[in-house]
């Protein structure tokens, strides 16, 4: 059977969404929204969307046949059957108001993802950190095993050149978003929880117990014959395990993990470890990603694959050949500067735990390099809520260039901006950070800061990623152009 025939067979098994033909995405340039839109385009739906700025996601969707408008306007939704929105979109958005007036159904991103998953074998990956990498690793293992899954990932899977793809099998592998509790819409066959920390607490009324209970509810969306794959190394996950009334498979470095990593070592970008599973021979593996946190992500993929009886050879090959994900400890190259060669790495992590894991991976893989971090805080509320944690973790680098907060649409909060954070780090006494008032000014500072052999790490979830790529394309020539607008 050809791939086209297999896809046709799959389509015949999955009911279409009744009369829905034309689907419009408000904020289509986001990775999650754009990924779902790409799958729907390839399923044959007429997809349109809008965002405040053009980016790689909108460009790709245009090439696939989606109709993209830059800017939000009521006329964009005049001829559509349903409007899909993310929580980043203000309810006063003109397209939302127009859809309400026209009585067009408005659904959240996770509701549309749930529809895609409804008639498939869903694998949903949740957790405060590591979702994108874990989802990418699972998709890669399943692809290596010939399972040809559909996947929707929150970052660019480098080997596929996209963050979403429509496969020909019954499998759908996707990130599950806890930031707005919308992951409760999903009803997968397998759920993964990587870890649980206090983040997006405005969604949960500042109540950490409510957040933990919501993760338990997410796992209880599994059928009674489904499988919950959880990281036993995480203290909060371990705490809620007695409340989970589903089959559990645990993973981690802990001795009581069902899927356990042993003999960990790291050299440069690669990690080596042995995985021990109940009833199976030990497996020696090479992971083409740095850091113990990524070994945990790989263990989740191994646990899911083992439960689905995927051959160890596919696991082994997928991990050693893994090409990474965009903006997840992404090596952008080595560049000559007047003072010597500098290595440039870009990372999306924007929570203190994520930043700490990135620093640890950099220290382990390149212990002789001076670590220079250009960090852009993301959201005033996160900076306020985790302020002391940020002060502590950012003090661990050798040189810190601290940009102002990327607001992501939030109003400024006094005492939770880049200048305040810079002062607090300086008062701690471990290093003297340099405040960068505008991303454009970073290039002006770098020549005086960088030394031969440095590892320059650009870190954060805002437009610092665009700046990092601009530095790479100019070989750290520091000819910085205008950065993209903050996307909706």
From Swiss-Prot:
Positions with a binding annotation for ATP? 127-133
Instruction: Establish whether keyword Cell division is in the entry.
Output: yes
Q: Name one GO molecular function term.
A: ATP binding
Q: Which GO terms describe its biological process?
A: cell division; cell wall organization; peptidoglycan biosynthetic process; regulation of cell shape
Q: Report which residue ranges the record marks as coiled coil.
A: none
Catalytic activity reads: UDP-N-acetyl-alpha-D-muramate + L-alanine + ATP = UDP-N-acetyl-alpha-D-muramoyl-L-alanine + ADP + phosphate + H(+)
Location in the cell: Cytoplasm
What is the disulfide pattern of this chain? Answer: none
Q: Which domain of life is it from?
A: Bacteria
Q: What does this protein do?
A: Cell wall formation.
Q: Tell me its family.
A: Belongs to the MurCDEF family.
Among PANTHER family, the record links this protein to:
UDP-N-ACETYLMURAMATE--L-ALANINE LIGASE, UDP-N-ACETYLMURAMATE--L-ALANINE LIGASE-RELATED
Protein name according to UniProt: UDP-N-acetylmuramate--L-alanine ligase
Natural source organism: Shewanella baltica (strain OS155 / ATCC BAA-1091)
- Gene symbol? murC
């Amino acid at each position: 059977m050809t791939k086209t025939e297999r896809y046709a067979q799959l389509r015949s098994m999955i009911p279409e969404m009744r009369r829905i033909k034309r689907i419009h995405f408000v904020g289509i340039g986001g990775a999650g929204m754009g990924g779902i839109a790409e799958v729907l385009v390839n399923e044959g739906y007429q997809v349109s969307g809008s965002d405040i700025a053009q980016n790689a996601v909108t460009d790709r969707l245009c090439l696939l046949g989606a109709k993209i408008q830059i800017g939000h306007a009521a006329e964009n939704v005049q001829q559509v059957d349903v409007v899909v929105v993310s929580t980043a979109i203000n309810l006063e958005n003109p397209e939302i108001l127009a859809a309400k007036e026209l009585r067009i159904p408005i659904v959240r991103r996770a509701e549309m993802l749930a529809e895609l998953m409804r008639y498939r074998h869903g694998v949903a990956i949740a957790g405060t950190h590591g979702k994108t990498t874990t989802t990418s690793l699972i998709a890669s293992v399943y692809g290596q095993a010939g399972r040809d899954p559909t996947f929707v990932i929150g970052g660019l899977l480098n080997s596929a050149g996209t963050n979403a793809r429509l496969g020909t099998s019954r499998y759908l592998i996707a990130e599950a978003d806890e930031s707005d509790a919308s992951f409760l819409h999903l009803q997968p066959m397998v759920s993964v929880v990587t870890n649980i920390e206090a983040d997006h607490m405005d969604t949960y009324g500042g109540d950490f117990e409510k957040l933990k209970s919501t993760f338990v509810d997410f796992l209880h969306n599994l059928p009674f014959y489904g499988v919950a794959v959880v990281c036993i190394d995480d203290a909060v996950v371990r705490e809620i395990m007695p409340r989970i009334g589903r089959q559990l498979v645990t993973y981690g470095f802990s001795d009581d993990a069902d899927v356990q990593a042993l003999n960990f070592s790291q050299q440069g970008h690669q990690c080596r470890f042995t995985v021990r599973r109940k009833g199976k021979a030990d497996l020696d593996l090479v992971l083409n990603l740095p850091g113990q946190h990524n070994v945990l992500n790989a263990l989740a993929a191994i646990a899911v694959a083992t439960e689905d009886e995927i051959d160890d050879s596919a696991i082994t090959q997928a991990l050693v050949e893994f090409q990474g994900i965009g903006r997840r400890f992404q090596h952008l190259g080595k560049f000559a500067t007047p003072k010597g060669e500098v290595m440039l790495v870009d990372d999306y992590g924007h929570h203190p735990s994520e930043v700490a894991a990135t620093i640890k991976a950099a220290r382990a893989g390149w212990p002789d390099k001076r670590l220079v971090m250009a960090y852009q805080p993301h959201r005033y509320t996160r900076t306020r809520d985790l302020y002391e944690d940020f002060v502590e973790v950012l003090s661990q680098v050798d040189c810190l260039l601290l940009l102002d907060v990327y607001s992501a649409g939030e109003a400024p909060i006094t005492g939770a901006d880049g200048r305040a954070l810079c002062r607090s780090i300086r008062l701690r006494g471990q290093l003297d950070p340099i405040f960068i008032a505008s991303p454009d000014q970073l290039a002006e500072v770098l020549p005086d800061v960088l030394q031969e052999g440095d590892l320059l790490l650009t870190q954060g979830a805002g437009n610092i990623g665009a700046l990092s790529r601009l530095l790479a394309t100019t070989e750290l020539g520091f000819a910085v152009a205008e950065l993209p607008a903050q996307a909706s």
